[in-house]
Design a protein with these regions (language model features):
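Short, solvent-exposed loop/turn segments at secondary-structure junctions
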Residues: 9, 34-39, 59-63, 80-82, ...
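Short, conserved loop/helix-junction motifs that constitute active-site signature segments
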Residues: 24, 44-49, 136-138
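Receiver (REC) domain switch-region micro-motif
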Residues: 29, 92, 97
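A short acidic, Gly/Pro-enriched loop at the edge of an enzyme's catalytic core
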Residues: 81-93
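S-adenosyl-L-methionine-dependent methyltransferase catalytic module, highlighting the catalytic core
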Residues: 93, 101-231
Length: 232
C-alpha cells in the first residue's frame, strides 16, 4: 500500500470526496483523469474498501504502473467527452481534472486533437466533461464529486500553451446553470483556502469576490472549489 500522507490541495480535496461516499461500498465508482495513481486518490479508495472501481484518462495506464500491480480495476483510455453513456455509475470522482480539459498537459493536448493544429484549444471542454459526468449518473442517489481551482487566473507552460483554468464566479455560475439543463443540481458546495498549502481553512463563496483576488496564487491554485452534483 502506498503512503496516504496528503500534500498540497489533496489535504482538502481527498477528505472532501471521501466524505461523500460510503465506506466498503460495492457501488460502481469511476475516477476521471486517473492512470498513474500519483495523488493518493486511488489509494484512498482502497482504504475506503471500494471494490468496483474503473479509471479513465486520455492517457494510457502504464503497464508496469502502480494501478496494474496493485488493483484489478478496469481502465478506459478515452477522451472523456467521448465516453460511452451506456455506462452508469454510483460515484464519479474528478479531483483537479476538468480544469485541464481542452488545454495542454505535459505538452500533450487534453483532448483528441484529430486536426493536428498546434495552436488550438477547446475552451468549453471542461463544461462538456462535467455534463458528460452528469449523464453517467445511475440514479438520484448517485453523485458526481468534483474539485476545481477557484480564482481569476489561467496557467501556461514554458511554451506558452494554456494548461490550467481557474474558476471565477461567472464560470462557476455557468457550470451551475449548464447542469440544470441536463436535470442535475449542486447538492453540496465548499471552498477551501490556504496561504501555504499546509494549513487549510474552509471558506464560503465570498472568497470569489474581486476584493479577495490578491490572496490567490496565480502559479499554483490555493483556493479550491469542491462540489457535488446529483440528479434533481
Amino acid at each position: 500500500m502506498k503512503s496516504t500522507v496528503l500534500k498540497g490541495t489533496k489535504k482538502v480535496e481527498i477528505p472532501y470526496f471521501l466524505n461523500q461516499i460510503e465506506h466498503g461500498t460495492d457501488k460502481k465508482v469511476l475516477i476521471v483523469g486517473e492512470c498513474v495513481a500519483a495523488d493518493q486518490i486511488s489509494t484512498s479508495l482502497i482504504d475506503k474498501e471500494c471494490k468496483d472501481v474503473t479509471t479513465t484518462d486520455i492517457r494510457d495506464r502504464p503497464e508496469d504502473g502502480w494501478l496494474n500491480s496493485n488493483t484489478e480495476w478496469k481502465h478506459i483510455n478515452s477522451d472523456f467527452i467521448e465516453f460511452d453513456e451506456t455506462n452508469k455509475y454510483d460515484y464519479i470522482i474528478s479531483i483537479s481534472v476538468f480544469e485541464h480539459f481542452g488545454l495542454f498537459w505535459d505538452n500533450k493536448s487534453m483532448f483528441d486533437n484529430s486536426t493536428g493544429v498546434d495552436d488550438y484549444i477547446r475552451w468549453n471542454h471542461d463544461i462538456k466533461g462535467i455534463v458528460k459526468s452528469c449523464k453517467l449518473l445511475k440514479d438520484k442517489d448517485s453523485k458526481v464529486i468534483i474539485t476545481l481551482p477557484a480564482g481569476p487566473f489561467m496557467n501556461y507552460n514554458e511554451s506558452g500553451h494554456p494548461i490550467l483554468r481557474y474558476y471565477d464566479t461567472q464560470r462557476q455560475n455557468l457550470i451551475k446553470e449548464t447542469i440544470k439543463g441536463v436535470g442535475c443540481k449542486l447538492t453540496d458546495e465548499k471552498f477551501y483556502y490556504s496561504p501555504d498549502y499546509e494549513n487549510w481553512s474552509e471558506s464560503d463563496s465570498e472568497i470569489n469576490q474581486p476584493k479577495f483576488y490578491h490572496i490567490n496564487n496565480s502559479y499554483t491554485p490555493n483556493v479550491i472549489w469542491a462540489f457535488t452534483i446529483q440528479k434533481k
